[in-house]
Amino acid sequence: MYPYRELDAGKRYVFITRDGYIKQSPETEFEPKRTYKSRASTAIKLKSNQDRLQAVYYIPDQEDYDVFLASYKGYGLKYGLEEVSEVGAQAAGVKSMNLKEGDHVQDGLVFKRKQFQEALFITQRASVKKMALHDFDRTSRAKRGLQILRELKRNPHRIQFMIGISQNKFLVNLLTDTKKLVQINPDDYTVSNRHNNGSFVLDTSRDGKPVSYYLSDNDSHL
């Protein structure tokens, strides 16, 4: 939810979808209609029945921003937000990432270019790794990107979650399908390179597979 006092065409929203599309839309595109109390307005046109919105970001200024996308099969792509054109609320946007067969965009981050940005990756096998996104070369929109997980022939890792790490300290509370809760402190992890698959935080055969997470203050330990 993004509150506002008045709509401003200089402010905008960035939408990132599962099927590999991205767009920017001015805030004024979302002026409430007469039926706003009973009927939701369209924010983006999805390309397929399987498509869904993976991330939304509010951009309040005209500073330089970068986009980082992570695919389910472990590809990462970084490029400038200026490569994404501004379009209306009814549009689907432009291609964000060149996806392999059976792959999809799992999540995306949008952050100020001058900002030091890290990300925490959690795989379906409950492995955790931290990466510094400034180590990625800024390339172009709609490319495939680089692998950020080492591919294994047997039981390969797949990205379940990507969490942007800000200067504010927090804990990641990871929940499994057997209702086991594990706390992860991003500060406990050193920055890894692209070919590292991270370290396991639990045994999925015993504790279940990761299904969701929430963030809490750094002092709210279990």
Question: Language model features by range: what are they?
Answer:
Residues 1-222:
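Short, structured "edge-of-domain" segments at secondary-structure transitions
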